[in-house]
Structure formats: structure tokens, C-alpha cells
């Protein structure tokens, strides 16, 4: 999905691109900029240094805050009003390169996982499109990350378990960050597991 959005932005600017099914130095010959999406492992230095200009990636937190996994969860846990999409230069360290562009995507208290995921994708597309505009105007500014560094842990299936002693209002941020199809929220009651399914409806629409 993200790849399709980015390729659409590239084509709309009249630029050329190629999609890579694997990472090797030969495939990056004659490439100016390499952009990774959906790569969940560190990319070797020989790959990152191959493009003529730079290698870039996206992370949905205001780097250096929220490095690592589960950026949407980090955003909610830290009571942020926006999902911040950072386009940054890839390096040998995790989420450590300079910032190329950042976009703030407003989020509301009623946004649950499908809405948050859609906003994330649109934020990435907007961020990338604005970056391309600047690039075509002859501008490419890479700023060092500033601020306090912190990391977010990886989510697993058990990360969707809720504390049954808390109220639904207290649990809402934990509930809405769960993917209902893959990792639905649940709680354990004595010897049974209760899996939650829900729908968000604005009161004015009832």
C-alpha cells in the first residue's frame, strides 16, 4: 500500500523509479535516492552508501523520540495530539540519521486502528510529496536529530492483553491501537480469554 502511494507521488512529479524485490548493490547502480518502506531489519552499510545522493526511510514519531517499534502505540501512550511522520536519512544505527522532512498528522480521541493506519499512510504520502517538491527545486536539507532519545518496544500478540481491573475509559488507548484482525484486544477472566470487537460511532450519527 505504502509503495503504491509513494510510486504515485513520484509519477505525478514526472520522475522515474524502480521497485526492488531484494537488496543488493547491483540493483542500486545508477540510483540517486533509495527509499525503504516496510523493512524491519537493519540495512547493511554497503547498501545505504550505494545511491549517489542518500538513502531514506520513514518513521512515525518525532525522532529522536520513539525510536524502534510500534510508533503509533508510542504516540498514544505519550498523549500526543499528532502522529509525526519523519523522513530521515538511513544510517547503520537504528532510526538515527538526520531529518529530511517532518509532517504532523492530527489525531483525535475517537481514532482507532483502521483510522490511525489510514492517517499514517496519508502522512507518509504527504511527507514524501513535499520532499519531492523541495528536491525538484534544488533543495535537500538534512538536519541532525535534536532532543531526548527514547525507544519503543516491539509489540507481540500478548501486547494486546488488557488489565481487567481497569475501566474501559482507562483502557481505550490500549484498545484502539490493537489491530482487530491480527491482534485483537483481549482480557483474561479466571480461566477464559475474552476477545473484544467493537465499532466507533459518533454520537451525532446514532
Regions found by a protein language model. Give the residues of each.
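One-carbon transfer enzymes
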Residues: 1-206
Amino acid at each position: 500500500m505504502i509503495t503504491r502511494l509513494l510510486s504515485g507521488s513520484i509519477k505525478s512529479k514526472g520522475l522515474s523509479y524502480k521497485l526492488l524485490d531484494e537488496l543488493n548493490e547491483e540493483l542500486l547502480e545508477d540510483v540517486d535516492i533509495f527509499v525503504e518502506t516496510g523493512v524491519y531489519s537493519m540495512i547493511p552499510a554497503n547498501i545505504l552508501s550505494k545511491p549517489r545522493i542518500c538513502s531514506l526511510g520513514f518513521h512515525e514519531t518525532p525522532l529522536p523520540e520513539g525510536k524502534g517499534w510500534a510508533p503509533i502505540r508510542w504516540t498514544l501512550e505519550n498523549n500526543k495530539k499528532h502522529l509525526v511522520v519523519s523522513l530521515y536519512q538511513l544510517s547503520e544505527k537504528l532510526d538515527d540519521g538526520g531529518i529530511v522532512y517532518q509532517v504532523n498528522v492530527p489525531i483525535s480521541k475517537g481514532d482507532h486502528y483502521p483510522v490511525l493506519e489510514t492517517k499514517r499512510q496519508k502522512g507518509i504520502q504527504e511527507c514524501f510529496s513535499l520532499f519531492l517538491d523541495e528536491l525538484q527545486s534544488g533543495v535537500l536539507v538534512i538536519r541532525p536529530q535534536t532532543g531526548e532519545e527514547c525507544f519503543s518496544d516491539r509489540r507481540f500478540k500478548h501486547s494486546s492483553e488488557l488489565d481487567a481491573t481497569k475501566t474501559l475509559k482507562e483502557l481505550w488507548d490500549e484498545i484502539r491501537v490493537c489491530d482487530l484482525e491480527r491482534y485483537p484486544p483481549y482480557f483474561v477472566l479466571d480461566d477464559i480469554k475474552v476477545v473484544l470487537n467493537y465499532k466507533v460511532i459518533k454520537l451525532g450519527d446514532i
